[in-house]
């Protein structure tokens, strides 16, 4: 039975990370580095820098130090105040700077900017996601 389970996981992962699936293979290293956040902050910041470079530069200028940590705090505050679904759908605003944390599939391909933004989403398939720093327990697969 264990071999069948591993094979199923491998088949799912193989499809997801194929060109047809569109997901990236990843590890839980980013989550382990910031376990107390329950978020891969490095991936989130990389996404924001790639898709919203002007906003990120403005944000960095406003921060005296640790822009990534301050960005996490702004994101966390937005989630606490507005809810995760709202932040995913509409983004959030911090000190006059609007940020998006994902882009939804456009209804048509007529808007090149919308298509480009959608293609820049970072969807990850993570095998053996360790959810606790106190033991070695893990979830077989996580989609992030």
Task: Mark where each language-model region is.
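An alpha-helical interface "stripe"
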Residues: 1-144
